[in-house]
Amino acid sequence: KKVTAITAQAGYAVDSSSKKVLFSRNPKMKFYPASTVKLLTALVVLDNMKLKDTIRVSRRASSVAPTKAGLTRGASYSVSDLLKVLLATSANDAGVALAEAASGSQERFALLMNKKARSLGCRNSNFTNPTGLPDKRQLTTAYDLYLITRAAFNNSFIASVMRQKNVTIAGSDAKPITLRNHNKLLWRMPEPCVLGKTGYTRSAGHCYAGLAIYDDGRVIVVILKSRNPYSDIRKILSKR
């Protein structure tokens, strides 16, 4: 089926069972990933830390640019809770706190991100921070992001977090933080169920890296530099 008017400048979608490529546009062209990099951040954290480990939030982490969860500076949170707000609600403060705890600094963490990406088969990407905040050197391709997304959704913890419409966490200060999942498809599309990481900056446009779950299979779908991401995802999935 020919799909018209997909606004994304790049994308890649694969049916996991048949391995059929449902959509491919500029799969090796480099784009800014925005917050879709948080899937890679989560994979690196899970390789290096335990979910029950606790992390004290630094001044640097608490004062990072939005989007953020509003973590309390000096309070401690579990890795599990920080990953929940990182993945479901795109919290940059959680991303910085996790990166600092896993490796000492965002710069050192970026080295781990690149190493992990290479191990997954990514050949045309460069990662410089755990949040996806704008950096001209942080680039990926739709195909590389597909490899990262596939690995992320194979992780049962990441997949379970992405299903949650709302997440609530509390740190050592006992102040609960409740936030909505940024992925509007959890509300808009009952079938298939589409779990996904959103991303947006002015330079990156709208990005999305997700998993569509059908009764009889799964599709990994990635788009970069879109003007209308949810419509694009719907149109790509209609090709199945």
Regions found by a protein language model. Name each.
Residues K1-Y143, L147-S156, Y214-D215:
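Active-site-adjacent loops and short helices of periplasmic peptidoglycan-processing enzymes
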